[in-house]
Amino acid sequence: MPLLRAEWWEAHQPLVVFMWIILLVVPFAIVYGAGDTFETVLECIVNDYLTFIVLLFGLFCVSGNITVGGDFAGSPRVNACLLALGTLLSSCIGTTGASMLMVRPVIKMNSWRKRKRHIMVFFIFLISNMGGCLTPIGDPPLLMGFMRGVPFFWSMHLLPILIFNLVILLFVFYHLDKKAYRKDIAQGRKPDISRPGTEFYIEGLHNIIFLIMIVGAVILSGVLPGMSAFQDAAGNVRGIRLYGEVTLTLPALIEIVIILLAAFLSFKTTDSSIRTKNHFTWGAIKEVAVLFIGIFITMQPALMLLKSVGPNLGISEPYQMFWATGALSSFLDNTPTYLVFLTTAGTLGLTGGITTALGQIPVNLLEAISCGAVFMGANTYIGNAPNFMVKAISDENGVNMPSFFGYILWSLAFLVPVFILDMLVFFL
């Protein structure tokens, strides 16, 4: 709908999302009963959506209070360096954090250009997705793996695969951008640089403290549940029971409070002129909040089906895990998809590899599942949370981004061939 009638969608977005939720909830309630349906929806909102949107909100606020300026213009060389930097940064502060921190500077440096949609598409490929594969901080699926016994630094095993993909995609990007850059120059477009040179400055740099607070909150959410102080006598994580078995856990509550505090302090300590320079508005986060609550709720039946049949799918080889996890992560939330196939791998009864709470998982299977979940979230706008956020901010700032299906064509053209190479080189 937002692709067919954008103005109508903006005016009626909450109503449309609510309609789709009702279309799912009513049949679900008829089959399973109102009580179970309410519990399922509430559990989805409390345990998945709430921490998800609070994290996005916090990163959106803090990154919006940091602005980068100077004499750098969006040339192919500068853009390639920015993408490489952002890709590596994603594993340090998360794909969402890196995306929100880098998206406005990249857009600003390329504001003089006409042909720039490819820049933001590759931004999503690399910074919003692939770059998050090296640590549990990078992407939520890896954080879930860490919470279930995968060592914190194990995901550094994925560095050769990341470098392999990064080199290929940056090579392709550089030549695409070089061609577009020459066309822009030929049409008389020039970067808006007042003085030649390499002057560079960052305003609102103190917000890095609040960014670190948010990253720390995410790490705590993975560490605290394993501590005895946060467990009851039965070994369950302590929390506030809301309805039935639905509980807002204390670690999740602590994470939410820290993130909201970081966002509040960021706004209180940063001059509003910085947000003005960033063309900061609430439009992008509002759209993501409304759209993703619909996605989270309406994907529950598919995830329930996947959980019930996952161990019986006959998937046991690394290349099968890579494609199965990746294909479903493209359209469902990659975190539960990762957990389903991680559980499947743990039930195969294989020996050797990593000892987790789900069983022994061979390294090659764990690599395939991790790469499938993290890398293939880039296949669609809804595959990973930062994707749609980057699209929304880009649209707000005058970048003509591809439509939903148009973006899929980009991923089919540039990502799928890389994934085929990944399979041939690493997973066969």
Where are these regions (language model features)?
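Core mid-bundle transmembrane helix pairs that form the ion/substrate translocation pathway
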Residues: 155-269, 425
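Transmembrane alpha-helix boundary signature
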Residues: 3-7, 25-48, 57-74, 88-101, ...
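Hydrophobic core segments of alpha-helical transmembrane domains in multi-pass membrane transport
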Residues: 1, 20-31, 56-64, 163-175, ...
